[in-house]
A protein has these predicted regions:
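Extracellular loop-to-transmembrane helix junctions
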Residues: 1-19, 72-102, 111, 354, ...
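Helix-loop-helix module between adjacent transmembrane segments
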Residues: 10-11, 90-106, 110-178, 253-257, ...
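Extracellular/periplasmic helix-exit of transmembrane alpha-helices
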Residues: 207-223, 284-343, 413-417
Length: 510
């Protein structure tokens, strides 16, 4: 628990110190923002700063800092280090700079920014890549809440139908994607964001009250086995199949750095009245998400390694797991991330906890899904030059967009392992998007004659992570660790040589 407290303090100091430095490097001023100069009453409009923060937090969070942190904790306390350093020096900086760069470019979406600084060909690649990722977000985040809702209502044949809830969620997606941002998103999302923050705060208080003995960074960096039979845990087998490098950095994305955020920040960049609010909104929302990830990583360690699962489930359920273990499921297989959320919230927080778990497991992914599709609509509209003031022109894009998303969802449901495959590719695509964004920000800082190492180092690191995952993953090239690591080093050298060559060429032209 001492490591947990130190990590919390580190994130707060990161916001106060490094966040201030990042804002100083960018240099926000009092120039008119797109919310004022391009106001259209649909996507460009001024919203209160507190509301923008809450919407931004909910948009970028979803279930990422919860599910990802729970699974990331299976690697041990080393997950704390990735959340701290990833969030402060990569994720929060990535979100702030991409959001502010969007403001400086009239509220432009990510592909437009990439095209401006990395070239037209890269822009076209990013357009396809971004829209595919956003459609995958929509498909993935409609499937899991539909399963949860059908399970809750399973006593009724109609209300307990998974297909019924998929249709309901998709209808909501269509409405939220088409309507002006202040009609649903501006009114409802702050409430959901408050619920997630309240849940995280209540769990943090519960951790301080219980003060469980957990592995510390300085004594058990990867080994978390304290009170359980190692065979029961299943973490050793998990780590063997998914090596810590690069899989930890893919598993914990939203709590450290996530390329998806760069598609969401422009949504709020179009609603900010003053550039100087960028630090608390963009950098602050990501630090807040990092704190949520820390809390859930600690809850996961308590649940699996301290024996917390025995305290949270009934004696009958505990005996049932023990009886089935021989040839059956390990702890991490029997209690997956959504199950841990439900059990811990209900056990620690009572009836209110069950409601909060429902909001976290259902509302959060749905709200990420609809803003993802809204971003896709705006990215496509920006690319083809179709204004979005009229409902008819919004439908021109939304109809084919939703048709393709439904196609991905149908494939996911028909394939026995479809969800897991989509999720893995979503995780890789998500982090690959951050690579494009970080290189874009690096070029921008070079052109502005500002310190570019702050984006160059994360860009190189995430380039290595994404290339290694592509080389080593069983669902991709599956080359084996030695070949994958060798290949990633070669890619790192190529990326660095490319940048240095471009940098020297650019300097000569100045």
């Amino acid at each position: 628990m001492v490591s947990f407290v130190i990590s919390l303090v580190a994130l707060v100091l990161g916001y106060l110190l490094y966040g201030k430095f990042v804002a100083h490097v960018f240099g926000p001023d009092d120039r008119p923002t797109p919310a004022v100069t391009k106001a259209d009453g649909v996507d460009f409009m001024v919203l209160p700063s507190w509301k923008i923060f809450m919407i931004q937090f909910l948009n970028i969070a979803g279930t990422g800092p919860i599910f990802g942190a729970i699974m990331g904790a299976w690697y041990g306390p080393v997950a704390y280090l990735w959340i701290i350093f990833g969030c402060i020096f990569a994720g929060a900086m990535h979100d702030y700079m991409s959001g502010m760069l969007s403001i400086r470019n009239g509220g432009a979406g990510l592909p437009e920014l990439v095209g401006k600084y990395l070239g037209g060909r890269t822009k076209k690649v990013m357009l396809v890549f971004s829209v595919l990722l956003l459609m995958m977000v929509g498909a993935v985040f409609v499937y899991s809440p539909a399963i949860i809702m059908s399970g809750i209502c399973n006593t009724d044949a109609f209300w307990g139908s998974q297909m019924f809830w998929i249709v309901v969620i998709f209808v909501y997606y269509v409405i939220a994607t088409l309507l002006p941002i202040d009609k649903i998103i501006g009114k409802v999302y702050p409430l959901f964001a408050f619920s997630l923050l309240f849940m995280a705060g209540a769990l943090m208080i519960g951790l301080f009250v219980k003060w469980p003995t957990l592995p510390e960074l300085w004594s058990n960096l990867q080994s978390c086995n304290l009170n359980e039979n190692p065979a029961w845990l299943g973490t050793e087998s998990f780590v063997q199949k998914s090596p810590i490098f690069p899989c930890l950095f893919i598993t914990i994305a939203c709590g450290a750095i996530s390329g998806f955020h760069a598609t969401q920040s422009p949504l709020m960049a179009r609603c900010m009245k003053n550039e100087k609010m960028g630090r608390p909104i963009f950098y602050g929302a990501m630090i807040t998400e990092g704190i949520v990830a820390l809390i859930w990583a600690t809850v996961s360690m308590y649940f699996f390694y301290y024996g917390g699962w025995r305290e949270c489930v009934s004696p009958e359920a505990a005996q049932q797991f023990i009886a089935q273990f021989d040839g059956g499921k390990s702890l991490i297989q029997n209690f997956d991330a959504p199950t841990v959320v439900k059990i811990v919230c209900s056990s620690w927080l009572g009836g209110a906890g069950g409601i909060l778990a429902l909001l976290g497991g259902v509302a959060a992914p749905i709200t990420s899904g609809d803003t993802a599709l809204r971003s896709a609509r705006l990215i496509i509209a920006e690319f083809i030059g179709l204004e979005q003031r009229s409902m008819r022109k919004r439908l021109y894009i939304c109809v084919p967009l939703f048709a393709l998303t439904v196609g991905i969802l149908v494939w996911q449901m028909e394939n026995p392992d479809g969800f897991n495959i989509i999720w893995q590719y979503f995780g890789w695509a998500n982090q690959t998007l951050s690579v494009f964004t970080l290189w874009t920000l690096t070029v921008y800082l070079v052109q502005q004659k500002k310190p570019f190492v702050m984006t160059l180092v994360p860009a190189l690191f995430m380039t290595v992570i994404c290339s290694t995952f592509l080389l080593i993953s069983p669902t991709a090239l599956a080359l084996g660790e030695s070949l994958a690591y060798t290949g990633s080093v070669i890619i790192l050298v190529i990326a660095l040589v490319w940048f240095l060559g471009w940098y020297r060429s650019y300097q000569k032209k100045q």
